[in-house]
Amino acid sequence: PVTIRESVEGLLRVVNSYYSNKIEGNLTKPSELIALVDDSTEHKSKGLLEIKRHIEVQVKLNFENNPREDVAKQDFIKAIHKAFYAECTPDELLVSSSDNAKFYEIEPGEYRATGVVVGQHRPPKPDLVPTYMSWFASAYKIEYLHGLSKYYAMAASHHRLAWIHPFLDGNGRVTRLFTD
């Protein structure tokens, strides 16, 4: 039988995915999510498929044997990104520049090769991303964190990963999956 903990974890996965994707502009309604969870929808919308991928990555991260000390490492963060985009069609891997003048292809699990602007924020240039991510991995090594500092580091690492914006697209989702 399913334990209460397993039931709550499953529910929280759906809720976290719903809000994480809503932040990104996904307009899926909660009633559609129920159909997704029941797997009773044959023709899934793009938004529903995004949420489904998000939940699948959450499950994968939860049940794979990921050593805790690896969570801030570049390979782990790249693996989150790769897992989220692994099942995308070629069309779903295209993003346009802010002026729609140019299209770029998302490379799952790879750092961006072009500069980006996020609102008023200009993340580090692409050639500096590996350096920033190397710093990130060493600054947030879990074995160096004790007591309450783990919680402060969790919040700070969430902010810092979003600030670095290492990928062409999916940074918000990757950051929230990382923090989850």
Regions found by a protein language model. Give the residues of each.
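FIC/Doc superfamily catalytic core
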Residues: 1-180
